[in-house]
Design a protein with these regions (language model features):
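Exposed beta-sheet edge and beta->alpha loop/turn motif
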Residues: 97-152
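TPR-adjacent "capping" and linker segments in tetratricopeptide-repeat scaffold/adaptor proteins
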Residues: 22-27
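Bacterial signal peptide processing site
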Residues: 16-19
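Short, aromatic-enriched amphipathic alpha-helices that serve as compact interaction elements
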Residues: 28-47, 55, 59
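Short solvent-exposed beta->alpha transition segments
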Residues: 49-101
């Protein structure tokens, strides 16, 4: 279960269509910025899958990379069930359910391309960025989708 949660967590991180590929997360981005980059990228995933994977991988915590990597394996995971449910999503909304100085949990409601709604919890940790002593927000966990009875 922990492995599946960590895997799902990593798959959900990406950037918007106008954003450049993120090789290293930026300390200037707050957790909400990162969450929006991720979900906007998922919304436009099919327009540039390689870029989305690069960004998702870039915002993943090192512990998650160890479990889901290498990046080529991770890329295949993203387009497989149940992880592909977020690809090309239509809309999303979110709220903070837990927050302290180093962790934040978001409950994210997603309208999938299939017109079904589901909720996931996305968890970030403020931690040392790789190749830097600066702090940045990285994905440490994502829950499996919990679907609603009906969509639109």
């Amino acid at each position: 279960m922990v492995k599946k949660t960590l895997i799902l967590l990593i798959l959900l991180v990406s950037c918007s269509g106008s954003q450049t590929v993120v090789d290293e997360p930026s300390k200037s981005l707050n957790s909400e910025d990162v969450l929006n980059l991720i979900f906007d990228s998922y919304k436009n995933f099919s327009s540039n899958p390689e870029k989305a994977v690069d960004v998702i991988w870039g915002f993943a915590h090192e512990d998650n990379k160890e479990i889901t990597g290498p990046k080529e394996r991770f890329s295949q995971m993203l387009i497989s069930e149940p992880y592909n449910s977020i690809i090309d999503l239509k809309e999303y909304s979110y709220e903070v359910t837990y927050e302290n100085e180093t962790n934040i949990h978001y409950e994210v409601k997603v309208l999938a391309k299939t017109n079904n709604y589901f909720v996931i919890t996305w968890v970030f940790e403020k931690t040392e960025c790789s190749d830097s002593e600066e702090q940045c927000w990285l994905t440490i966990a994502v829950t499996a989708p919990s679907y609603f009875e009906s969509g639109i």
